[in-house]
Regions:
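Transmembrane alpha-helical segments and their boundary/interface "anchor" motifs
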Residues: 25-28, 32-34, 39, 43-78, ...
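Extracytosolic (periplasmic/ER-lumenal) interhelical loops and adjacent juxtamembrane/interface segments
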Residues: 87-101
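Aromatic-anchored segments of alpha-helical transmembrane domains
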Residues: 3-11, 77, 96-98, 142-154, ...
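Interfacial loop-to-helix transition and helix-capping segments at the boundaries
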Residues: 16-28, 102-115, 155-175, 194
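Hydrophobic transmembrane alpha-helices
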Residues: 13, 37-45, 71, 75, ...
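Functionally critical transmembrane alpha-helices in membrane proteins and complexes, commonly lining
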Residues: 1-45, 65-68, 94-95, 105, ...
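Lipid-exposed faces of alpha-helical membrane segments in multi-pass integral membrane proteins
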Residues: 3-7, 33, 70-74, 88-91, ...
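Solvent-exposed interhelical
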Residues: 117-146, 180-195
Length: 197
């Protein structure tokens, strides 16, 4: 998915190809689903065992933030945006939190990381505050709520923000959560049948 995103974004940028641009967003959607699929068991393990979330956050941020900030500084220097107001919007990942929030979108590919960072920052805390044992019911409920919100905003915001807005793409990560949960349940259910043959 990562290579697909990079290739499609590059092709769309160089040749101004609208088809490749839409294809790049599809790959990003799949990337979000894959991210949720991979991180779901890690997060659920932390929640069920009531472990400190600091370890979860630390591991995630070590993998993503150093390279992000390095590239942000490099791009901002090259585009004369270092320490500008827009630069700090990228620092706090709020550049796509609302339409037209940023004047100079000098680091446009950062929108996808903003979605992931806000999701993994707030979603575990929400689940912990609800303090429920069956987290999957809450996850499915939130997923449907996000889909309804996304449908509501479909005709109210311009198309580019609809595809890249931080709080309009969170549903894809939850889809990965749900897929992993039900695949896990199916495998657990089939295991006794396999051993019984």
């Amino acid at each position: 998915c990562g290579y697909g995103v990079a290739i499609c974004h590059l092709y769309a940028f160089v040749y101004q190809n609208i088809f490749m641009e839409y294809l790049s967003y599809l790959f990003v959607e799949l990337f979000f689903v894959l991210s949720g699929f991979v991180l779901y068991p890690q997060l659920i393990k932390v929640l069920y065992k009531k472990k400190n979330l600091n370890i979860f956050y630390l591991r995630r941020w070590i993998r993503t933030l150093p390279l992000y900030f390095l590239m942000l500084i490099l791009v901002s220097v090259l585009t004369n945006n270092f320490f500008s107001l827009d630069f700090f919007k990228y620092v706090f990942f709020i550049q796509k939190a609302a339409p037209n929030l940023i004047a100079n979108d000098f680091y446009p590919v950062a929108w996808s990381l903003s979605i992931e960072e806000y999701f993994y920052l707030f979603f575990p805390i929400i689940l912990l505050l609800l303090n429920k044992e069956n987290y999957i019911k809450i996850i499915v409920f939130i997923l449907f709520a996000l889909i309804l919100i996304k449908m509501f905003f479909a005709g109210l915001v311009e198309s580019n923000f609809y595809r890249t807005g931080t709080f309009l793409r969170l549903d894809a990560i939850l889809v990965g959560f749900v897929i992993h949960h039900f695949i896990e349940k199916i495998l657990v259910y089939k295991k006794p049948l396999i051993f019984g043959l």
